[in-house]
Amino acid sequence: MFFEFKKHFWKNPVLSLEISRILCNASSYVLPQGILKVEEGAFDAINRKFDDFMEGKAEVDELMAEADRLEEKLNEQLNRNFGYLHELGLEPHAKVAFVSRILSRGFVYPDVQIFVGKRACKKLRELSKVERRILEGRIELGKGREKLLRLEGKLLGYPDCCVGSYIESKRGFPAESRFIMECAEKGVFVKSLKALKSSKLISIPYLFTSNFYPCSIECSKAVKVGLKIQEWLDEFEDAFKLRSMLIALFYAATALRASKAAGNYGEKLRSFFSSLSPGDIGLIETLERHSGNQAEFTNLFIARILGGFSKG
């Protein structure tokens, strides 16, 4: 299996690093961000049906049937574009989501989460069942969202303590803000900046994927997941290290934006950034400009630093 993984690694390093979590048995699925793109216009039909549903002109059955059609269409497209995943025993699985996993209240316009895993298991299908129960009013929105987050946490191999911390943050201080402040106060951002400027690689194992907020940078369970992936990657462990550094610095870029806000949180971040050199700020500003295409930037950066992007 590692031979096949090695053969395809440089086609998309970020995607390869994501799926390594499955191949080393650290998770059943991964949810790559900004890699498996959806064509424009793909949401037109589901958006219209969702509008009808919200206005009482369509039933839940009709909305879910439209979601099934969209998922089938997207899976066909994704399998064409990422057919090499089959050589690794993996395939993409598009799942339509109506309930925001980020916002604390309300529905969202239909969105698609694109998982990658070995096959569509019962737990993956359970996500749609929970979404349906929420839409039908059979389960309260807040409790339903919590159930969705716990299900996804299991599928993605996230430690229970980290999932629980994220769910709890929905009732108070956001998990991203808490984690960013911890990284600023405990030297994670500074350590990553120093390493990058001196052309050194360091491992930040709890940052094994983007959009994951460990309950603490000292969470031994999150660290254990990252180290397991890093060990399995063998000759590609430097790519894991470099990506973990970039994930940390993209969080620093988020912090830089947040430092412009009023309030105690913004004030603390302004104090942190005032301690950095103009060169450090400039580097973070560069990453901030690429926050919208983080995966693409990371792929190119890994290729430039480690080489071999055109191989395979």
Swiss-Prot record:
<dbReference type="InterPro" id="IPR007556">
    <property type="entry name" value="DUF483"/>
</dbReference>
<protein>
    <recommendedName>
        <fullName>Uncharacterized protein AF_0426</fullName>
    </recommendedName>
</protein>
<dbReference type="Pfam" id="PF04467">
    <property type="entry name" value="DUF483"/>
</dbReference>
<feature type="coiled-coil region">
    <location>
        <begin position="44"/>
        <end position="89"/>
    </location>
</feature>
<keyword id="KW-0175">Coiled coil</keyword>
